[in-house]
Amino acid sequence: MEFITGRHIPRRTFLRGMGATVALPFLDAMIPAGRVWSRIADDALPTRLVAIEMVHGAAGCNEWGATQNLWSPEAVGRDFDLAPTSLSSLEPFRDYLTIISNTDVRMAEAYQPYEIGGDHFRSSAVFLTQSHPKQTEGSDVYVGTSLDQLYAQRFGQDTPIPSMQLCIENINQSGGCAYGYTCVYTDSISWASPTEPLPVIRDPRVAFDQLFGAGGTVEERVLRRRTNKSILDWITGRVAQLRRELGPNDIQRLDRYLDNVREIERRIQRTEAQNTSGESRELPEAPAGVPDSFEEHTRMMFDLQVLAFSSDVTRVFSLKMGRDSSARVFHESGSDRPFHPASHHGAREEAILDFAKINRYHVSMLPYFLEKLQGIQEGDTHLLDKTMIIYGSPMGDPNLHNHRRAPLFVAGGANGRLEGGLHLNTPDGTPMANAMLSLAHALGMDDMDSFGDSTAELSLSMPASTLTSTGS
């Protein structure tokens, strides 16, 4: 517990320059003298939320894959072994991990004969809404309000950006896809209302400029970009002035934050230079700011989220990790098959194991993010303690296009609302919406009585003795 003394500066202090607006991290100087750091920080900054969709299910959701614990561990409760699972890379963060196995996403299923075959084109819209999309190829879309947007509407309205939506692969939010469904359903996981899908950002440069480059006029922003100078070069005078007003701890915190801003900016600039050099690209259709490397692209997006959370520019992110129909090859995973063909494993054990390599590789991106959050101090603790990260898929076995035993886990402390270090295996037929309802309550939306097709709240601290003993 630390009491603050000295000069007070407003929480919403920005460093402004030509075509630049840089928010500040939470500093001691932002707390009125005589107040307690931890109490103010907890009151001022609600839980940060990240919702990540892994597309097209998991190898461990196949019946044979479940017996091999290819997705989640065999043991329930706290004494689980992650080694054989796709979550093995999360072992260093097991105390922040809540695995929720055996839930179904029934709203992604076909409800009418004419909807059969449209699983690819419904699923993403269902993940965070747990609602059944209206079949249409036009603009009269209808599904539900997503969990991230319900949270943003309640806890994100006093931040400069209520929420941001990111993606890794190319999307096309226009026209019809197939089986009578518009591509908007395929491409959107965040819905501000049942009829309002939110656009997503693939290019780290665009995301960076939204977070830090929104100041000044359009002409000033264009000029800043043309100079190829750092965004920080336009605020050096204001930084120097602010440093004279801060104590040693705040100066160190400010310098580290600005160093992180500059570091991600340099990486984006290097990527743009590489991708406009005339050399051939693995992703020729991608914007110049998008790395050809899946890992580097994902890390850039995670780093931008950490910066946004530390400066409270936004408290809510969603991230779509890919597309169901992706033909991308993830060589680093150890599989040389394109994603979508690999997912259709034909129930062959060797092919199921091959797809599990891709699942494991995708999950292995997350520890980088968790470590970065853990490295940002805020009050008496760090950002990982104050963040909830939902990671899952609305698809179960991709080979069958079913939505049973869908993969889902949660990472982070959620401001003390999640115990962590726990594997829950729900009874057969439990809707994923039950888990989402409980997560909404953990986020502070305690007055929500239902969500999607939920039937009850799911206890996130269920005693291991009351659970079954089969993983998935």
Where are these regions (language model features)?
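Ligand-binding pockets and gating/stacking loops
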Residues: 1-472
